[in-house]
Amino acid sequence: MEQHEEAAERKPSPPVIFRLFGVEVRGGGGGVDEEEYEEEEVEGGLFIKKSSSMPNLTSIDPLPVPADGGKRRASDDSELASGQQKRRRRKVQERKKGVPWTEEEHKKFLEGLRQLGKGDWRGISKNFVTSRTATQVASHAQKYFLRQTNPGKKKRRASLFDVVAECSDDQLPSPQSVGTKPPTQDIIHTDRGDVPILSYPVARGFRGDSVQVDELTEYVKRLKAAEDMSLSMISGLEMASSSISSLELSIAPPHCAIEAAIKVL
């Protein structure tokens, strides 16, 4: 009996095997060979068991300690962030930097503005300034109009708009010169006679930034007055012609009256 008890005590219990994160881990039982483990003394007089299948713990080099003792400065982070911001700002400036307009392109722009008028930037870009897009033409026009509406500023740097605008003022008629021209008479030939009609010059080539509301209103009033005058003259001629025709019908011709008198006799 004693021998059986000693054999049972010596018989190792089966090890407990479980899987942890895909790795089989043995524990619990005494069936693990003692040869696989060896004791190693570490600092402080402590002993740990390590497996022979694992790499030597003492062969692992300690992590290098930085010169500043592991202390990071906040200024380093701020310098890094400022450097990144400067690079981004430089890239944005390079992207936004465009090619300046030449004098020839600006002259073509003024010619297109004179013929097509303000607002047709797509037509100016397509037919006149072909080297620029419609968006670029609209931006250039905005700068041009701002420059023209504020011409009296002192100590202002010379610009392309000023140089070309002086050359192109002779081609663009001013609203004062167009509005003060005397009206011309157009004669309409009719069956009842010649009818004179007053005609005012058509306001073409006006620049949108220099035309005043009062001048446009006065111009429209003159056109309306001339139209009313022409209609009244035409209606007067029609009434006169109708009255003349009625008189001709009511009055008998003289030879008809003589023939009637002869018959009576």
UniProtKB/Swiss-Prot annotation:
Record GO terms (molecular function): DNA binding; DNA-binding transcription factor activity
DNA-binding residues (ranges): 121-145
Matches recorded under NCBIfam families: myb_SHAQKYF
Gene Ontology annotations of biological process type: positive regulation of DNA-templated transcription; response to ethylene; response to gibberellin; response to sucrose
InterPro entries referenced in this protein's UniProt entry, alphabetically: Homeodomain-like_sf (IPR009057), Myb_dom (IPR017930), Myb_dom_plants (IPR006447), Plant_Stress_Dev_TF (IPR052245), SANT/Myb (IPR001005), SANT_dom (IPR017884)
Pfam annotation, one family: Myb_DNA-binding
Family matches, as PANTHER family: TRANSCRIPTION FACTOR KUA1, TRANSCRIPTION FACTOR MYBS2
Known function: Transcription activator that binds to 5'-TATCCA-3' elements in gene promoters. Derepresses weakly the sugar-repressed transcription of promoters containing SRS. Contributes to the sugar-repressed transcription of promoters containing 5'-TATCCA-3' elements.
Ranges of compositional bias, category Polar residues: 50-59
Keywords of the record: Activator, DNA-binding, Nucleus, Transcription, Transcription regulation
Motif, Nuclear localization signal: chain positions: 71-78
Swiss-Prot/TrEMBL induction comment: Induced by sucrose. Slightly repressed by gibberellic acid (GA).
Compositionally biased residues, Basic residues: 85-94
Name the UniProt record assigns to this protein: Transcription factor MYBS2
Region named Disordered: 29-101
Main location: nucleus
Compositionally biased residues, Acidic residues: 32-43
